Amino acid sequence: MRYFIFFGYDGTNYHGWQIQPNANSVQQELQRALSILLRKEMEVVGAGRTDTGVHARHMAAHFDTDRIPMEPDQLVYRLNRILPRDIAVYEVREVAPEMHARFSAISRTYHYYIHTRKDPFERHYSLQISYPLNFEKMNEAAQHFLHHEDYAAFCKAGGDNKTTICHVTAARWIQTSPTTWYFEITANRFLRNMVRAVVGTLIDVGREKITMEQFLDILHNGSRSDAGESMPGNALFLEEVGYDFKD
């Protein structure tokens, strides 16, 4: 039987989602907890990979097993007793056997947070900017993502992507306080480091390091070296993974 598990985590102390040698990962912690409770070695498949220090408010994964020997809510409770305090499970649900955490996802939404003044309480979860930014221009530039498909310019060099085509359905800067903004972007898929490179390039637009014409050239020429730098991962949150559940 196949089960989906929905959870969130603070990525500060993890080297990303995926298991890797000699480094702590969220996948490792989740598999360890499931293996203890179900009394056999478990493998979980995530909706995607988050990099070192990146957070997730609502991540999804699946695992296969015989019917779990308890109610899903009880499994959630017991998992949260075992897992570290920076990982929280919200829901476990049985799904159709063909549902796949990664390949059945129809959308993913990320938020990237910026503070325009120094804030000691947000320093671990946002990028703190000391220079002025023109968010109106940044939003104007972001709208071009809705009509563009090839994101080679924002893909980490040497990646293993078979294609750099992504379908972006939302891209905008949203202000939540006089000094707090976040960039929201939704797409069917993302390339490695894509969101952080997109944010870095939009910041270059906002601080007028590049013109709108130069931004459009970057968008269309596909050269990673021309785009902005990849922003730090601590301000990036995987906000939601969308599925079309039939039940």
Summary of predicted features, one role per range:
Residues M1-D247:
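Structured-RNA-binding interfaces characteristic of tRNA pseudouridine synthases
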